[in-house]
Design a protein with these regions (language model features):
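Substrate-binding/access-modulating region of protease and related hydrolase catalytic domains
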Residues: 32-44, 63, 98-99, 169, ...
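Active-site core segment of subtilase-fold serine proteases
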Residues: 62-194, 202-213, 217, 224, ...
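C-terminal subdomain of the subtilisin-like protease fold in secreted/lumenal serine endopeptidases
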Residues: 80-82, 227, 236-238, 307-310, ...
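Extracellular S/T/G-rich loop segment that most often corresponds to the catalytic His/Ser-adjacent loop
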Residues: 108, 129, 296-386
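Hydrolase catalytic cores
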Residues: 163-166, 170-171, 198-201, 235, ...
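Transmembrane beta-strands of outer-membrane beta-barrel pores
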Residues: 546, 578-584, 622-628, 650-656, ...
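Repeated loop/turn-to-beta-strand initiation elements of outer-membrane beta-barrel proteins
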Residues: 571-575, 614-622, 642-649, 654-657, ...
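Outer-membrane beta-barrel "beta-signal"
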Residues: 725, 729, 779, 783, ...
């Protein structure tokens, strides 16, 4: 036989039925070498007649979308496999992944197609030796080149066992529990994937007995099988076989060709692991199985292009199987573990595997077997790759990403005890014992790394897209519902449907910070030096905050001095200044900041007002204010009388730094800014000479440059009362800072994925109103103590800060005492 022969990586145990597994029993040898065992077989009981097939489930909605909770798929036949629950496969099914449209080549001993669990499955077969002579054996076990004879079958059914792990049809309807107790059948991990079962065992090898018992594979046969799979355009190749590493690179080169063709190649690591010991003669024997066998050992080499993986086995307690070859150093980053001990799959009829056994059932259907070996770990990984490629079409263009996802999301395998095969400890991270760890589909089907939305022409993080804007727009992004169901991408560019409400709730609290004024700055101004002079109709006042003496920072800039100047003339007044702001009739809350365009500008801003009396006792004010990034210009008309005053105005304002005190356009790749035209009405009433009532309201039409918005209107209002009390005056203010009351934004958003994995975008319209309404309450008492000493005590409460419903209330208190110097 040309080339070193490879063997099946398996030992199997028969089960009585799919519902009643054999608790104890002897091993039935299926393949020679690679850890196969020999002995008598336990015969299955006659299974109950199969139930009528359930009605097909309704077609799932287009992916990505959750069609049911994972628990809905954890049916009897799911759990009967033993392996699927160990890797969390139900998480893949929950979002509609089935393997549909993915073709997996199983290079093995062939597969039957009429097993009860293959009815409806897409399984095609090909035999590389059916019409072309292959290296093989005659009836005496001597080497011969021949085509396969019709009676040359693998009575162990190794290829059928492997195929069942991948593609056994799901019978349970996840939408109902009616059939969950049906006592027959299992399901494959990728139960809607198609399988190309390529038979490549050497003709006559499966019929050998004695020391050479079991199916064997010549390198040349395997090469032909791989080349055939490449020619057929399969997506994944599963090779549940292997042997000793030799110097002939023919087989390895064929695997590399498959990888270069864009095919993912999944190979059993081997079943040769044996700890060091002594032989029958008492001689010391070194441990074996420290590395994957041939051809799995090439996983991880550069020529494999990240598309070849070696698969080891774990038992039902998630411990590495004694027989499983370890990862070794060269392949450890491409060595993954999956269930391979005590799992249940489809097999040949017991009359073929155990002919003449009186306990065999009377039918000629296939049966179910409990099996062990890395032969069955590999198809779990092959099926998992099919699920990923089905669910995330973008991975088809870069199939190595699908494999990388499984490697990156594997559960790290840590065992503090030195491994009996390698003598090393399976520590944190990839290691020579367990490679990257145990496959975890629940994690593999979760978004990984940075998660982004392709909005308009920009790609922004979910946190940035859904973060509350603050200012007038609050939490519009999550409140609008427009982001629900959009498609976001993870670091592998996979698409997922967005649950915007849940994502927004998971964002860190306090992203917008506190709106309480800076108490240090307020204290500095309370302790400021103030001067004022007046000469005739001209007055001038200035205020300089105190300098903080900090020995750790002795060279501080001098504080900015604010000033106010006024000149009165017949019928009018001119007033200008820096800092503070234009006086208003409407009351304001002093202990909370109103970001953006408020009543006043920062201490660095300048302002001016011209007042002129017109007819009917009315006064017209023209005013303007500027700061580095904000400007305000307007006109108002009002009247000041003894007991009452009012003012109506219109103003134009712009802010080049924020969207009305928040951040909105930035998530669309534009600069936060705003322009608005505001209409205001404010008044003051002093009905009894002592009680003063004042209020103000504003409605504004808003434009947000850089984005497509329509009909944005905001509101803002305040009411207050002041009354003398003892040696001072008590004031109470209730105010709502500027809030968006109407308006929409239209933007291009990712709404779907096509069958090539390309993001599909369409226009989405979202409301800009926030979920809550911030109301601020403030009480102030300003009083005289004695002489020139004065005091102030204030307390304020803000409910639904930043107009976000359910956000925690904020409160603050202030007390100051001062005197003239």
């Amino acid at each position: 036989v040309a080339g070193y022969e490879k063997n099946c990586m398996t030992s199997i145990r028969l089960v009585l039925t799919a519902a009643l597994l054999v608790p104890t029993g002897l091993m039935l040898g299926a393949c020679a070498g690679g850890g196969g065992g020999g002995g008598s077989a336990v015969t299955p009981l006659s299974p109950p007649p199969p139930p009528p097939p359930p009605p097909p489930p309704p077609p799932p909605p287009p992916f990505p979308a959750t069609i049911a909770q994972p628990s809905a798929f954890e049916t009897r036949e799911y759990n009967a496999t033993v392996g699927l629950p160990l890797i969390g496969a139900s998480s893949a099914y929950a979002i509609g992944a089935t393997g549909q449209g993915i073709r997996v080549a199983v290079i093995d001993t062939g597969s039957i197609t009429d097993h009860p669990d293959f009815i409806g499955a897409s399984i095609t077969t090909f035999d590389v030796c059916a019409s072309t002579a292959c290296p093989g054996y005659d009836v005496t076990g001597d080497s011969i080149t021949q085509i396969r004879q019709s009676d040359d079958i693998d009575t162990g059914g190794h290829g059928t066992l492997v195929t069942g792990v991948i593609a056994a049809v799901r019978q349970d309807d996840f939408t109902t529990s009616v059939d969950d107790t049906v006592a027959n059948g299992i399901q494959g991990i990728a139960y809607e994937a198609s399988v190309l079962a390529i038979r490549a065992d050497s003709p006559g090898s499966c019929a050998r007995t004695g020391q050479d018992e079991g199916c064997a594979f010549a390198d040349s046969n395997l090469v032909r099988a791989i080349d055939y799979a490449i020619a057929q355009g399969v997506t994944i190749i599963n090779m549940s076989l292997g042997g000793e590493i030799d110097s002939d690179p023919t087989l390895e080169n064929a695997v590399r060709r498959a990888a270069q063709a864009g095919i993912l190649v999944v190979i059993s690591a081997g079943n040769e692991a044996e700890p060091a010991g002594t032989d029958d003669m008492g001689n010391s024997v070194d441990a074996v199985g420290q590395t994957p066998s041939e051809p799995a050992y090439i996983a991880g080499e550069a020529a494999s292009l990240g598309r070849v993986v070696a698969v080891g086995s774990i038992d039902t307690s998630r411990k590495i199987s004694d027989f499983s070859n370890r990862a070794g150093n060269a392949a450890m980053n491409y060595y993954l573990m999956a269930p391979g001990e005590g799992v249940v799959t489809t097999g040949l009829d017991d009359n073929i595997t155990n002919p003449g056994d009186p306990t065999n059932d009377l039918d000629s259907d296939g049966d179910y077997y409990r099996v062990s070996g890395t032969s069955f770990s590999a198809p779990y990984v092959a099926g998992a790759l099919a699920l990923l490629l089905d669910a995330f079409p973008n991975l088809k263009n870069n199939p190595e990403l699908a494999l990388q996802i499984l490697l990156d999301t594997a559960d790290d395998y840590v065992d503090a005890s030195p491994d009996l095969i390698t003598g090393e400890v399976a520590g944190a991270g990839a290691d020579s014992v367990s490679g990257v760890g145990i496959m975890n589909l629940a994690e593999a089907f979760r978004p990984q790394g940075q998660q982004t939305l392709s909005i308009s022409i920009d790609r922004v993080s979910l946190g940035e897209a859904l973060a509350p804007s603050g200012g007038a727009f609050g939490d519009w992004a999550s409140n609008s519902g427009a982001f629900n169901g959009l498609v976001f991408q993870d670091k592998y560019d996979r698409g997922f449907r967005l649950d915007a409400e849940a994502t927004a709730k998971s964002l860190p609290k306090g992203l917008l910070g506190s709106r309480v004024v800076d108490m240090n700055t307020r204290a500095d101004w309370a302790a400021s030096q103030s001067r004022a002079i007046a000469v005739g109709d001209l007055s001038f006042a200035w205020f300089t905050p105190r300098v903080q003496e900090d020995r750790l920072a002795p060279y501080q800039a001098e504080p900015v001095t604010n000033f106010q100047a006024a000149y009165s003339f017949s019928g009018g007044e001119v007033e200008f200044g820096r800092g503070g702001g234009i006086s208003r009739l409407a009351p304001v809350v002093t202990l909370f900041n109103e970001p953006g365009i408020g009543n006043a500008f920062s201490t660095s801003g300048s302002w001016a007002r011209v007042s002129h009396e017109i007819e009917f006792g009315l006064t017209m004010d023209l005013f303007t204010a500027t700061e580095e990034t904000r400007s305000l210009t307007g006109v108002s008309v009002g009247r000041d009388a003894r007991f009452w005053s009012f003012r109506a105005g219109i103003s134009s304002a712009s802010d080049e730094e924020t969207a009305l005190g928040g951040s909105l356009q930035n998530r669309f790749g534009e600069t936060d800014q705003a322009a608005m035209t505001a209409y205001s009405l404010e008044g003051e009433w002093n009905p009894f000479g002592r009680l003063t009532l004042n209020s103000g309201m504003e409605m504004a039409s808003v434009d947000l440059p850089g984005v497509d918005t329509q009909d944005i209107w905001t509101s803002r209002w305040s009411v207050g009362a002041t009354h003398p009390a003892g040696p001072g005056a008590l004031s109470f203010v209730v105010a709502q800072p500027r809030r968006a009351e109407a308006g929409t934004i239209r933007f291009l958003a990712p709404t779907g994925i096509d069958d090539r994995g390309e993001i599909l975008q369409s226009d989405v319209e979202a409301g800009l109103t926030p979920s809550g309404r911030q109301i601020d309450y403030e009480t102030r008492y300003r009083f005289t103590l004695f002489g020139d000493w004065t005091g102030e005590a204030s307390a304020a409460l803000s409910t639904s800060p930043n107009h976000i419903s359910g956000s925690g209330d904020e409160s603050v208190a202030w007390f100051a005492v001062g005197t003239k110097w």
